[in-house]
Every structure is written in structure tokens, then in C-alpha cells.
Amino acid sequence: MIIEKILGNLHELPASEAGAFAGLHQEKVVLPSAQLVKRIQRVTTDHGKELGIRLPAGSGDLRDGDILHVAETNMIVISVLPTDVLVVAPRSIHEMGVVAHSLGNRHLQAQFFDAGSEYAADVMVCQYDHTVEDYLKHVGVPYERQERVMPVPFRHAEHSH
């Protein structure tokens, strides 16, 4: 089976549509975050079914909860594996700027969340890297290492001087 479009996302369905999917069995395509940026790939569900994903150019990244296929009693959805991340909680705008500058010099991508997010605080999140953890310990910036399903995949940052 070739998947050429995303039918919706389980986490964003309006209440009026959510009921239609409530009784369906969820077959999952479990992917690491790095695979979410590929619009053409071959995947296998947790039931051993092989699928091809071929999304049109300009399609957004795959996300946790994306619905790939719906049949009578079954649906196939994307399930994203947690990513090993550092959740950095700077105490001031100065501390945030210094840490963000250091991460930028290392070409690491960061995602930013505010107090209204699932983190319930103003934080920046980057993929785990032992040198970043050592740096944060050295400068005394509060952080926590966590396993998280990120809403947006981290992308490799191309760079040249």
C-alpha cells in the first residue's frame, strides 16, 4: 500500500469527527523523530504490514498521531518514539541568551516553550549531547534530561563557513 496523503491527526480532530475513529483498532507505524522529515520512505506497522509513504513535495513533516489509512475496523497512525533531550530552564533573559548563543555555536537546534506548554515553564529544549550537558553543569544553568515526544522533529542544521 502506498500512502500519498495524511488524512488528519488524532490529537487535533474536532469532537464531531473523533467519535468516528473511537471504535477503530489503531495499527501503529513507530518512528524515531529523525524519520519524520522524510516524505518518501518504506515503513512497517506494529502488525508487520509494509507501507510506502510518498507525500507530495511541500508536505509538512510527519507528526505523532498522523492518520495514514482508515479501513472498516482498523486505522494506521504514526507513533513517534521519545527523543533524548535536555530541557533547559534559564533563570533570566541573560542566562537564556548566553546558553542559546552557545547552542548556536555548536549548530544545535533548540525548540522553545512557554509556561502555557506541557512543560509549564519557559524552557528551551535541545537533543541530548554530553558536551552540552557538561557545559550546562559548568555554567550552572538549571536543566533536566528527559525522554520526550517532540511536537516538531529536530532537523540537521546544514552549515558552512
From Swiss-Prot:
GO terms for biological process: protein folding; protein-containing complex assembly; urea metabolic process. It is found in: Cytoplasm. GO terms for molecular function: nickel cation binding; unfolded protein binding. InterPro entries: UreE (IPR012406), UreE_C_dom (IPR007864), UreE_N (IPR004029), UreE_N_sf (IPR036118). The keyword Zinc does not apply. Pfam families: UreE_C (PF05194), UreE_N (PF02814). Its main location: cytoplasm. Keywords: Chaperone, Cytoplasm, Nickel, Nickel insertion. The keyword Chaperone applies. GO terms for cellular component: cytoplasm. Involved in urease metallocenter assembly. Binds nickel. Probably functions as a nickel donor during metallocenter assembly. Belongs to the UreE family. This is Urease accessory protein UreE. The lineage of its organism: Bacteria, Bacillati, Actinomycetota, Actinomycetes, Micrococcales.
